[in-house]
Amino acid sequence: MADTARAANPDIIIFVDNCYGEFTQTQEPCQVGADIAVGSLIKNPGGGIAPTGGYIAGRKDLVELCAYRLNAPGLGKDLGCTLETPRDMYLGFYYAPGVVCEAIKTAIYAQCMLELLGKNPVPRYCDDHNDIVTCFDAGTADALIGFCQGIQAASPVDSYAAPEPSPEPGYTDEVVMASGSFT
């Protein structure tokens, strides 16, 4: 894909938001043609432990541009906020490969169940998994809300909560989600 984009525009900068994609393949985006990749430490690379943080990786000039844009003038990537959480971030990196592997196995199991229910998940259990996300059409908004509420009710954390759709910055439609996790 990167080669096709560069053939159309040699000056293109290929940017990848790799959230949920880390540790799912043997190569990361910058190894296959991306100029810059970003992600969140509270997702895959944080192993579900890191309470905050993100990363920027790629071409040195682009990383520096981002660092100067996202930090205080003159500080660049040499100084930044850690909120007293480096231990959690390092621990998250240590746990991340195992946690991501478990998440992919769980996604494959869920995809099998969804197929048995006729819900046509994407990706399918037999497809290559480039991230830990599974999509499916619940049919109606009420069915999706019920699905999320069922997941939440069976979760070890906040099982008393009843997810409801609400506006979310960056989305045109209301968002509903369930998470029985600690982070």
Regions found by a protein language model. Name each.
Residues 1, 25, 62, 66, ...:
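General structural feature for long, well-ordered alpha-helical segments within catalytic domains
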Residues 1-101, 105, 114, 118-122:
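Conserved PLP-enzyme active-site core in the AAT-like
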Residues 116-126, 130-183:
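Conserved C-terminal alpha-helix-loop-beta "cap" of PLP-dependent enzymes
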